[in-house]
């Protein structure tokens, strides 16, 4: 749960790719690399101490994202003037709350546990899509969502639920809501603009929370925040390239290698020891997601980067 915000993508299938690796293989490779980058972004958040100011870090992260995305925004501004700003504003504030909860979760939970709970986002989208969008769902989706939520309970171990675990579920909820709200954004809107507005429009809100939080500004957090934002931008770019190379239904399951990488990086960098409940819960979460990813989506037009 992760975590990141590249919206609904369409598929532009390529009939032939020269060389030894086909389009599906290249797409999977990009997704695997992208998810590895995203886990390292989470690791940069995890190096923070739990008592460091959360809202300051989130503000630094938003500011660095705005700096990184500004050239793309200026380049696309004339061709694609910003639209649907009220929906961008709503998504930005939901995402800001989610990022604050993400910092709380990552600084207090093992990396793999936090990521396993973040992956509940696609599962949460199933009931939310029925409730908010009035979508009809199949029995298969109900069953896969149920199995996935069983996995979440196994990871959580209800007797050990704490605020950090609830924060991780809050991250998943914010991601699910934002994924549903992306449908309110015109498909022709460049992804860079969407990412820019998602970070910038909630900066006054986060700045006010940082002022309320009090204390001196800890500028040493700037570089972890900048690094985390930069890695997420790389992840978003790799995802766009991957989904342009091959059909989403054929490669989307590669996204879930991120959870395996979170386990590996947690062991390597933070001396975490994943137990059997975590591994079993991860399986219950990932397998339904793979089943959902393999169902054929309706073709859509992809926005330009």
Predicted segments with their positions:
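Juxtamembrane helix-loop boundary signature in multi-pass membrane transporters
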Residues: 2-30, 123-173, 187, 286-305
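Transmembrane alpha-helices of multi-pass small-molecule transport proteins
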Residues: 26-27, 51-97, 174-177, 196-212, ...
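Loop-to-transmembrane-helix transition segments
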Residues: 26-33, 73, 77-103, 163-171, ...
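Transmembrane alpha-helical segments that form core, pore/gating elements
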Residues: 43-46, 54, 69, 159-217, ...
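Membrane-interface helix-cap regions at the ends of transmembrane helices
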Residues: 66-84, 148-161, 202-223, 267-271, ...
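C-terminal transmembrane-helix exit sites in multi-pass transporters
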Residues: 104, 121-143, 260-279
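Helix-helix packing/entry segments at the starts of transmembrane helices
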Residues: 115-120, 185-201, 236-268
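C-terminal-most transmembrane helix of multi-pass membrane proteins
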Residues: 260-305
